[in-house]
Structures are given as C-alpha cells and as structure tokens.
Amino acid sequence: MSEHAVSIDVREIMRCLPHRYPFLLVDRVTEMEPNVRIKALKNVTINEPFFVGHFEQYPVMPGVLIIEALAQAAGILAIKSQGERLENELYFFVGIDNARFKRQVVPGDQLVFEVTQMTVKRGIGKYAARALVDGQVACEAEIMCARREV
C-alpha cells in the first residue's frame, strides 16, 4: 500500500465538486499527495444513462466523458491541495492537449484515474492524466483547469 493511500468517499468528493448525478464521474479517491498527484476510480455499470444511446447494441463509454472524469479528478487534486473549496469558487476545465484513446471502456470496467500536477500558474493548473482499465491505458491527455470566483 502506498504511503499516500487515502480513502475519500463520494460524500467528500461532493463537497469538493459541484457535479451531481448523472455528471459526477469519480466514485472514490484512493491515493493523493497534495500538489503532486491523485489516484481515483469510477465503477462503470450498464446503468449509466449514456449507455442508452451510446450504443444500445454495443455499449461503450463516450471518450469525452472519460476526459471529463479525468478533469474532475484533477479538480479534486487542486481543491484538496489548497485545503477545501471556498463557497464562491469553482474549478473549470479549460483546456486539453495530446488526448489519445487507446482502449474502449464498457460496462463492468473499473476506470482508474492517475493525475499528476505539472504546473500551476495564476490559478491555472496543468495536469498529466491517464485513465486505465485492468492496468491498460484507455485514455491519456494533458488537462488544464482554472480556479475562478463565481
């Protein structure tokens, strides 16, 4: 077990992120090193609402939702690195570079998100992010999130 093992459950995640069903895409955080990295997961089930139309006969998780889940994990890392989310602030997904999809994600898979902080300047963080299934990379990208007062 990692020295940075934590167990942040969905209730605590909901205190960090404003997302709610059906758009909350992180179920649990299993490791975190503030200002460095986070490891989180999502259990993908046939009950996900997007499987109704993507695709009925061959359900595949949309790649953009995997990217969104990685951005949510990056947001949790950013928020937990500063302590807690302030009531009047949100973290917005503002950019993506070098996105690649390498494996389909289907019902029954467990997505493991590994996000590493690259830089933070003027409230904008850049993160190297990977989503894995059974140790295989399903998606990788560099993601940018910005902290904004609302």
UniProtKB/Swiss-Prot annotation:
<keyword id="KW-0443">Lipid metabolism</keyword>
<dbReference type="Pfam" id="PF07977">
    <property type="entry name" value="FabA"/>
</dbReference>
<dbReference type="GO" id="GO:0005737">
    <property type="term" value="C:cytoplasm"/>
</dbReference>
<keyword id="KW-0444">Lipid biosynthesis</keyword>
<dbReference type="InterPro" id="IPR010084">
    <property type="entry name" value="FabZ"/>
</dbReference>
<dbReference type="InterPro" id="IPR029069">
    <property type="entry name" value="HotDog_dom_sf"/>
</dbReference>
<dbReference type="GO" id="GO:0019171">
    <property type="term" value="F:(3R)-hydroxyacyl-[acyl-carrier-protein] dehydratase activity"/>
</dbReference>
<keyword id="KW-0963">Cytoplasm</keyword>
<comment type="similarity">
    <text>Belongs to the thioester dehydratase family. FabZ subfamily.</text>
</comment>
<dbReference type="InterPro" id="IPR013114">
    <property type="entry name" value="FabA_FabZ"/>
</dbReference>
<keyword id="KW-0456">Lyase</keyword>
<dbReference type="GO" id="GO:0016020">
    <property type="term" value="C:membrane"/>
</dbReference>
<keyword id="KW-0441">Lipid A biosynthesis</keyword>
<comment type="function">
    <text>Involved in unsaturated fatty acids biosynthesis. Catalyzes the dehydration of short chain beta-hydroxyacyl-ACPs and long chain saturated and unsaturated beta-hydroxyacyl-ACPs.</text>
</comment>
<feature type="active site">
    <location>
        <position position="54"/>
    </location>
</feature>
<dbReference type="GO" id="GO:0006633">
    <property type="term" value="P:fatty acid biosynthetic process"/>
</dbReference>
<protein>
    <recommendedName>
        <fullName>3-hydroxyacyl-[acyl-carrier-protein] dehydratase FabZ</fullName>
        <ecNumber>4.2.1.59</ecNumber>
    </recommendedName>
</protein>
<dbReference type="GO" id="GO:0009245">
    <property type="term" value="P:lipid A biosynthetic process"/>
</dbReference>
